[in-house]
């Protein structure tokens, strides 16, 4: 099962430098905190619609592969993050199998829990970078995060209903 928003997410083209954009737009795109929390601050009830979750091989993550360790399998999670039932963000998380050890095994068991609720409660979370991308008028971003030094890649596409626009 796929979703058109995830197809567009995978089509994002990334800027080599942070573009000169309106401050409000950059505030959303460069947010270091949880996007789930930001949506809730808008007075919304946040929920997850699961699109796809499970192990994949390298050939299913060509966009992410250069940014992650080369391994035989990766945990892939594709979701829509909804605010009061309306999709505001498409998310794609790729986790190398070597990251899935110790407390990070919980990444496989999030179910309908937003990723941000898990990540941003961890004292071991760090971020290597945020890259801004755009496709067909929609903005997105990707970040390589680390939990206890172990990497994962999160890509987010802001959908037309989101307050970023």
Swiss-Prot record:
Residues that bind substrate: 35, 77, 115, 156
Location(s) in or outside the cell: Cytoplasm
- Gene3D superfamilies per record: Chorismate lyase-like
| Highest taxon of source | Bacteria
Pathway it works in: Cofactor biosynthesis; ubiquinone biosynthesis
InterPro entries assigned: Chorismate--pyruvate_lyase (IPR007440), Chorismate_lyase_/UTRA_dom_sf (IPR028978)
Q: What is its EC number?
A: 4.1.3.40
Any one Gene Ontology biological process term?
Answer: ubiquinone biosynthetic process
| Catalytic activity line of the entry | chorismate = 4-hydroxybenzoate + pyruvate
Identify the GO cellular component terms for this protein.
cytosol
Coiled-coil intervals, chain numbering: none
What keywords tag this UniProt record? Cytoplasm, Lyase, Pyruvate, Ubiquinone biosynthesis
Kindly list the GO molecular function terms attached to this UniProt entry: chorismate lyase activity
What Pfam families does the database record attribute to this sequence?
A: Chor_lyase
* Role played: Removes the pyruvyl group from chorismate, with concomitant aromatization of the ring, to provide 4-hydroxybenzoate (4HB) for the ubiquinone pathway.
What is stated as this protein's family in its record? Belongs to the UbiC family.
Q: Which NCBIfam families match?
A: PRK11655.1 (NF008656)
Q: Which PANTHER family match?
A: CHORISMATE PYRUVATE-LYASE (PTHR38683:SF1)
How this chain assembles, per its entry, is: Monomer.
Protein name as annotated? Chorismate pyruvate-lyase
Q: Which organism is it from?
A: Escherichia coli O1:K1 / APEC
